[in-house]
Amino acid sequence: MSKIDQANKKAVERMMKSRPVWVDIGRARDVIPGIKDNLFLHAGPPITWERMSGPLKGAIMGGLIYEGKAKNAEEAEKLAASGEVEFAPCHHYNSVGPMAGVITPSQMVFIIEDKEWGGYTYSNMNEGYGKVLRYGAFDDEVLKRLRWLDEVYAPVIKEAVHLAGGMDIKSIIAQALHMGDDGHNRNRATTSLFIRTIASFVVETDWGKKTEYDTPRLDLSNVNEYFKGGKATAAAEVLAFMHSNDLTSLNAIMAACKSMALAAHGVENSTLVTTMARNGTDFGIRVSSTGDKWFTAPANVPDGLYFSGFKASDANPDIGDSVITETVGIGGFAMAAAPAIVNFIGGNPADAFDATNEMYEITVAENNNFNIPAMDFRGTPTGIDVRKVVEKNIVPRINTGIAHKEAGIGQVGAGIVKPPMEMFVEALKELAK
């Protein structure tokens, strides 16, 4: 076995042995090392304000208003362009965020601890559907929901996870793959398991028993008319919000996947990809043995199904850190576990199996934690090898949401995106040195 193969074996074994557990909730500036009041994190590789896409610019502007640094869009845009605000990838701070991925200093975040290798990873709270900051929206409705998440939702689930003694996210992913999820774009099973695991502790929290609090309540009447009265307990509202949002578990899953990927990073001679991320302008990867160096290329527009009234010309290029799921062997790599997803992203069930089968060509292992019943419980393809990607001319398969190119309009569809091959070629050239 060559030095590279030995290194890749070590890296992927570390990835699969990682044990990410949700242990706490905390304010970003208090718990993420290096965060300061003028630093805003975003999805993807590094980017300047001038090159940011519409959804990312909108999310940054919304974040500035939410933080009280600007009163309106005009002030926010001027401040963002002034150089007084610093921008950095979530990945530089062991964090991840879906779509625009903006994490502001005062936002509450999931804290995931790797119980095997040590260390922590982070992600923000999921806002649900409709107008949301992660798609660049920042009207009063968006800001109200963000405040409720930070001031009601976060304190309740923080107390709940303490009572529970933590939540094993890896176990939830493994179970969900047996229930029709892929761990990225289809989250119904993961969220159901997430709620089932935490619900009994939510109702036991002191915060959850409150029926009076100063933070404006969310309108949860879409879940049940009961919530129109405004006298439900905070616990009931938290559980109703979780019920209304299939993406409830996604951010914690992403942070758990970041934990697994981080475990494989920094292995000398390894050619494994340990980061994939997009900022709406560029797609970037990092490789285990090349440190913090990014290899980037222009992000492609996903190919998929569009919601009524939208078309391909409305789409923004690929955006978000959620591709960390594919990096560790789920998402598009586990599509065979979730054939129903083709109703959302296009194609037919056979395509889901073809996607997973093709990914075995560019990976170094079959995952010993995540397996697919319909493939005789074969482990998902795990550990993307830059050499194999270039040699076989096969890029990773990623399933993803599609954002509108203008800030604030939101998701306009979902589909499959192929990363640009140039990044992998550049990474291989660097490795050859």
Regions found by a protein language model. Name each.
Residues M1-K433:
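Anaerobic metallocofactor- and corrinoid-dependent redox/one-carbon enzyme cores
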